[in-house]
Structures are given as C-alpha cells and as structure tokens.
Amino acid sequence: MNIFDRKINFDALLKFSHITPSTQQHLKKVYASFALCMFVAAAGAYVHVVTHFIQAGLLSALGSLILMIWLMATPHSHETEQKRLGLLAGFAFLTGVGLGPALEFCITVNPSILPTAFMGTAMIFTCFTLSALYARRRSYLFLGGILMSALSLLLLSSLGNVFFGSIWLFQANLYVGLVVMCGFVLFDTQLIIEKAEHGDQDYIWHCIDLFLDFITLFRKLMMILAMNEKDKKKEKK
C-alpha cells in the first residue's frame, strides 16, 4: 500500500466536535470581524505612512481609547449591532494609525521587515489559535493569572526603563512580551469559547481581544526584527 496515495480528509481536520454548533457560528462571526479589523487597520497605517492625512499622536490615541470605551458601554443587541460595528471599525482604523511611527522606523531600517513581521505574526497567531481550538476545553484558562502577572511586571519594567534607559531591558521586554502575547492568544481564544458556551454572544467585543493580541504581537516582532537588522548593519561597519 502506497502511503502517498492516501487522501487527506480536510473536513476531519476542521472538525471541532468538542465545540457546540452555536459556538462555532459565534467564532465565525468573531473571525469575520477580526478580518474586517485587519483591513481597516491596514488602511489606517496607510493613511499615516503614505498620505500623512492623519498622524499618530495623542489625539489618535485618545480617539481610539474613547471609541473602545464607547463600544464597551454600548450593550450588544440586534438594534445596536451596526453602530457597534462602526465603532469597531473606527477603533481599528485609529489603531492602524497608531502603528505608523513603528512602521516608518522599520521602513528606514529595512522595508523587507514589514512583510516578514506580518507573515511571522500571522503564522504565530494561526498556530496558537488552532492549538487553543483543538485543545481540550478550558485547558489553557489557568494561564490567565500568570499572564496578567507577567503583563504587570512588563509594564512596571517599561515604566522603570523610562528613567534607566537600558537597551538590554528594552530588548528583554520585547522578547518576554512576545512570549506573553502568544500565551494571551491561547487564553483569549479559549475564554471566548467558554463565554460563548455560557451565552455571551458579543462577538464584536470578543473580536477586540484577538485583534489587540495580533497587533501587539506584530508590533513586538517588528521591533525585534528591526533592532536585529540595525545590529547587523553596525557589525558590518
């Protein structure tokens, strides 16, 4: 029997029998909204980097924060769905604008960093998402406390580094932060499943969690690649 003649059953690979059909439909809405956020964020980044019509700064950061709070304060219902999708799109757009300075920095170092970082982030996000979907339910929820503690330590060290100015601490924050965000992809994905199983159908807010995970992963991986590229250029000189 030739093992190469065996057919791969893709339906079996995509079958999540431990997740109820209603939750699977909920996840489809979450990831459809996530895809929308990615396109709108790309448009926001384009506006900052290419057209310079809207620049990243205090106003764009405050705008994204206000939209996020507004979205949180607006209850999920059929009547408010279109309004909340508009708020989600606005938040994603301003988040993309906020990526502008980091994108410009990477372009000055080496433009090839951007597609490399995006593809790397997409692969990491996809792998950890599938791991969370295929794993036994609630198996990664124990990470919540660990991840929040690690995030608090990263925030404190980042604030402390404002005064110390240590490049080593900055780099350590990037690498540790990358690992922590991978953990958040696992945790948030399974948390969304559990919330949906218990009746929480707010797919728009659930999308926010995954979108922020992806953006933070992308930003950290992009900066790691840019700093490594700068170090290589210094060594050549």
Curated annotation (Swiss-Prot):
Query: In this UniProt entry, which residues form the Lumenal topological domain(s)?
Result: 51-52, 108-112, 161-166
Description of post-translational modifications: Ubiquitinated by BFAR, leading to proteasomal degradation.
- Where does the sequence pass through the membrane? 30-50, 53-73, 87-107, 113-133, 140-160, 167-187
Give its localization: Endoplasmic reticulum membrane
Domain of life per record: Eukaryota
What UniProt keywords apply to this chain's record, in alphabetical order?
Apoptosis, Autophagy, Calcium, Endoplasmic reticulum, Isopeptide bond, Membrane, Transmembrane, Transmembrane helix, Ubl conjugation, Unfolded protein response
What name does UniProt use for this protein? Bax inhibitor 1
Q: Which gene encodes it?
A: TMBIM6
